[in-house]
């Protein structure tokens, strides 16, 4: 058994968003995501087969959900449940420092 800290090895600069899988079973996947000024490429949307619960642990981000008039701004501690196949995209993450997300992907019961 290993003890680790979610804020260990958080880089100060990244050419691409970093995704670390912390736990994976057939029913659930837990990821730490680090973004520094990253966004979903223009015209692309996430359309995932699993539900995703995400929380911002550090930094800030804006998420767009298809069909909603305004982006959702997420600050430290803000979380969001994205149901399977709800199309969404990351519009912006803070370029001044790392945004650290914790994402839990799970099957619909």
Label the model's feature ranges.
Residues 75, 84-109:
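Ligand-binding loop in jelly-roll beta-barrel domains
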Residues 47-63:
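Short, conserved beta-strand element in jelly-roll/cupin
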């Amino acid at each position: 058994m290993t003890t680790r800290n979610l804020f260990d090895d958080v880089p100060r600069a990244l050419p691409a968003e970093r995704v670390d899988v912390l736990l994976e079973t057939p029913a659930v996947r837990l990821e730490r995501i680090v973004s520094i000024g990253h966004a979903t490429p223009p015209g692309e949307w996430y359309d995932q087969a699993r539900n995703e619960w995400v929380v911002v642990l550090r930094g800030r981000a804006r998420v767009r959900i298809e069909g909603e008039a305004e982006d959702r701004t997420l600050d430290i501690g803000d979380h969001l449940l994205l149901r399977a196949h709800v199309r969404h995209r990351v519009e912006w993450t803070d370029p001044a420092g790392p945004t650290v997300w914790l994402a839990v992907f799970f099957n619909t019961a």
